[in-house]
A protein has these predicted regions:
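Extended catalytic-interface subdomain
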Residues: 151, 156-159, 175-209
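Active-site-surrounding "flap" and adjacent substrate/cofactor-binding loops of secreted or lumenal enzymes
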Residues: 1-11
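TPR-repeat structural position
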Residues: 39, 81, 114-115, 149, ...
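Amphipathic alpha-helical segments of tetratricopeptide repeats
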Residues: 47-51, 86-89, 93, 122-127, ...
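Asp-box/WD-like beta-propeller blade repeats and closely related beta-sheet repeat scaffolds
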Residues: 27, 34-51
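Amphipathic alpha-helical repeat scaffolds of TPR domains
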Residues: 1, 14-33, 54-73, 95-109, ...
Length: 216
């Protein structure tokens, strides 16, 4: 779909220099060649765009995300995560209500040795996007690393409940519920010694699984 969309842009299109920079970067990402090389080239392109247009916070977010994407399965992952997190925090300082900045900072610092760097973003993110069940859940990644079990529990509970509201509003199958948050909630209850609540969570998921199978 991306390749088709790019091919539909005429070379004579009257676009700004910045818009053309974005298009060229995207062409690199979805162009020919091995994926890891394209990912690296795209990341460098987004770095140039962000440096060229420092007020373009979205460019910074895409640059941060590109580094996070490259940090998987590489010996250089820690450096890339720290760099991605630093960029996300820079954007977060410029705009404390930027959802992507908070989101990517949490992902970047989702390690025991880095988690404190993401604590401010974790405490802020849920209030930035209250209708997003993923935004409600994500702070738990930092809270869990720091052993903040009550806070992690609340994040996952809110993620689960918000997803229920979303499924009901959109009138979609129950498979759309955020079972990732529910599973994390189960784990948090176990860590807190709240075994009855953990059992209740398990029964909820089992019930939904059975209903989902029967509806097919």
């Amino acid at each position: 779909a991306a390749i088709k969309a790019l091919s539909n842009i005429p070379r004579s299109a009257k676009l700004t220099h910045r818009e053309w920079d974005y298009i060229k970067a995207t062409q690199v990402l979805y162009g020919k060649g091995e994926k890891h090389l394209r990912d690296r080239a795209y990341s460098l392109a987004m770095q140039k765009i962000y440096h060229k247009y420092p007020k373009d916070l979205e460019a910074g977010c895409f640059y941060s995300l590109s580094l996070l994407g490259m940090s998987r399965n590489t010996e250089d992952s820690l450096r890339l995560q720290i760099e991605a997190g630093a960029i996300a925090l820079e954007i977060f300082q410029k705009n404390p209500n930027h959802p992507c900045a908070a989101h990517y900072a949490i992902h970047a610092f989702d390690k025991p040795e880095l988690a404190r760097l993401g604590l401010t973003s974790a405490k802020r993110y849920a209030s930035i996007a209250p209708a997003s069940h993923h935004a409600q859940h994500m702070p738990a990644h930092i809270f869990l690393q720091l052993g903040m079990w009550p806070e992690a529990t609340n994040s996952n509970k809110n993620g689960w409940l918000t997803s229920i509201k979303w499924v009901e509003k959109k009138k979609i199958p129950i498979s759309g519920k955020d079972y990732h948050s529910l599973q994390w909630l189960h784990y948090c209850y176990l860590q807190l010694g709240l075994f009855k609540k953990a059992e209740s969570v398990f029964k909820t998921q089992l019930k939904d699984m059975q209903e989902g199978i029967q509806s097919k």
